[in-house]
Amino acid sequence: DDCTTYCYGVHCCPPAFKCAASPSCKQT
């Protein structure tokens, strides 16, 4: 699993996603 973004220091987001308002990812 490729992680390019870490939301809140722990939640891993894949390359095509960014951090949402909560500790989760949303597609961009």
From Swiss-Prot:
Tissue-wise expression: Expressed by the venom duct.
Subcellular location: Secreted
Keyword hit for Secreted: yes
Molecular function terms, GO-annotated: ion channel regulator activity; toxin activity
Disulfide bonds: 3-13, 7-19, 12-25
Gene Ontology CC entries for this record: extracellular region
Domain of life of the native organism: Eukaryota
Keywords per UniProt: Disulfide bond, Ion channel impairing toxin, Knottin, Neurotoxin, Secreted, Toxin
Free-text note on domains in this protein's UniProt record: The presence of a 'disulfide through disulfide knot' structurally defines this protein as a knottin.
Function according to Swiss-Prot or TrEMBL: Probable neurotoxin with unknown target. Possibly targets ion channels.
Protein name: Conotoxin Cal6.43b
Organism: Californiconus californicus
Taxonomic classification: Eukaryota, Metazoa, Spiralia, Lophotrochozoa, Mollusca
